[in-house]
Curated annotation (Swiss-Prot):
Its EC number is 7.1.1.-. This is NAD(P)H-quinone oxidoreductase subunit J. It comes from Acaryochloris marina (strain MBIC 11017). The keyword Phosphoprotein does not apply. The keyword Ribonucleoprotein does not apply.
Length: 182
């Protein structure tokens, strides 16, 4: 009887160890940002080895400015995604450090996690002009508001469209007015 209880305790411990989140070591950019006084969270690397870093919305512009000053001069992609119904929305920025002799330029992805109820983040249009239409698309599809953007209007959907079509909890209208093809 005592053997079975000790076995179940050992089983519970091994299950708990398996479920424990792995320790993620901060990459070079996260370490540099931490040394510069920012509070960031290392998210590890993606399947291609690109370092991912979580920052808060109130630090985003300062972090972006620091990265530009460190040579991350190219905004390869800005996008958004929905973590799932009832979960957070994410605005992400994929940055490269381009130079004349770069064979494989350093890359980093910055992510800002936002509440579904009021997804607001500062626009990085004034840091990277390339974020203009990309932020508009994230606004149009997910409802993420980029504060300070010079022209934050819908870019894909009609202006009178209701809702954010790429959110996972979006309920599509029952009727779409279709135009006949000519």
């Amino acid at each position: 009887m005592a053997d079975s209880s000790s076995e179940s305790t050992q089983d519970e411990q091994s299950v708990a160890e398996e479920q424990a989140a792995p320790i993620i070591e901060a990459g070079p950019v996260a370490k540099h940002l931490t040394q510069a006084g920012f509070t960031v969270e290392a998210l590890g690397a993606d399947h291609l080895g690109v370092e991912m870093i979580k920052v808060t919305a109130d630090q985003l512009v300062d972090v972006a400015t620091t990265l530009v000053n460190d040579g991350y001069n190219y905004l390869m992609c800005q996008g958004g995604y929905d973590s799932g119904p009832g979960q957070e929305l994410v605005s992400m920025y994929h940055l490269l450090k381009l130079s004349d002799d770069a064979d494989r330029p350093p890359e980093v992805r910055i992510k800002v996690f936002l509440s579904r109820e009021d997804p607001r983040v500062p626009s990085l249009y004034w840091v990277w002009k390339a974020s203009d239409w990309q932020e508009r698309e994230s606004y149009d599809m997910y409802g993420i508001v980029y504060e300070g953007h010079p022209n934050l209007t819908r870019i894909l959907m009609p202006e009178d469209w209701v809702g954010w079509p790429l959110r996972k909890d979006y309920i599509s209208p029952d009727f779409y007015e279709l135009q006949d093809a000519y």
